[in-house]
């Protein structure tokens, strides 16, 4: 008889494990964002952060700076780069640190990312995942505390998910990365630090179907 190992992981650990497994599974998966590589490629800082919420810890050391890239503080710029790289055949993850910054990227998200599939008659895939933090409650100030997913669910061409526990977080991030349409994943700040009360997290890779 075979058994499946399950562990009680934090939400952030579950997301991080999903990223490592998706990077191993598909060489076209890349990541870009602010501080995701630990500090602009400085050797003594690599992996020190793994992003503000430690979701990307260990990726640059394992997969290198060609696939894990720190970006300037220019959200519209790196979201545009992610849109272009997805249209060109890569499978990017764009880490938008706080959802309050997403308005800066409105043109790229609403006029390019959401519409590209339709503008080309379904012939162009756009496998792009935006991950962002959402929610108040940690004293993060006005521009870091919004909950905006109710806006984005009304735009055709976008899929939006908001995981509620580590099990769903791991499976939904995997599903988002493998999806051929753009997905925005809203990770609540109050969930990312604690062990969830939901199902324990299997060690192997798995998907939680989006929309179910």
Q: Where are the predicted features?
A:
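Glycine/aspartate-rich loop-and-adjacent alpha/beta segment that forms the canonical ThDP
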Residues: 193-212
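Thiamine diphosphate
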Residues: 1-191, 203
């Amino acid at each position: 008889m075979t058994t499946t190992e399950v562990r009680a992981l934090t939400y952030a650990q579950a997301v991080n494990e999903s990223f490592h497994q998706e990077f191993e599974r598909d060489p076209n998966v890349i990541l870009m964002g602010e501080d995701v590589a630990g500090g602009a490629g400085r050797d003594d800082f690599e992996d020190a952060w793994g992003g503000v919420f430690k979701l990307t810890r260990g990726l640059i050391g394992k997969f290198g700076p060609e696939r894990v890239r720190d970006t300037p503080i220019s959200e519209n710029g790196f979201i545009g780069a992610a849109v272009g790289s997805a249209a060109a055949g890569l499978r990017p993850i764009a880490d938008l640190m706080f959802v309050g910054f997403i308005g800066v990227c409105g043109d790229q998200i609403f006029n390019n990312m959401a519409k590209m599939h339709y503008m080309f008659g379904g012939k162009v895939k756009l496998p792009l995942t935006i991950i962002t933090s959402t929610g108040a409650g940690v004293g993060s100030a006005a521009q870091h505390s919004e909950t905006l997913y109710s806006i984005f669910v009304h735009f055709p061409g976008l899929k939006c998910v908001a995981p509620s526990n580590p099990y769903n977080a791991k499976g939904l991030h995997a599903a988002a990365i493998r999806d051929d349409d753009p997905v925005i994943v809203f990770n609540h700040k109050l969930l990312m630090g604690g062990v969830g009360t939901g199902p324990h997290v299997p060690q192997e890779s798995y998907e939680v179907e989006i929309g179910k």
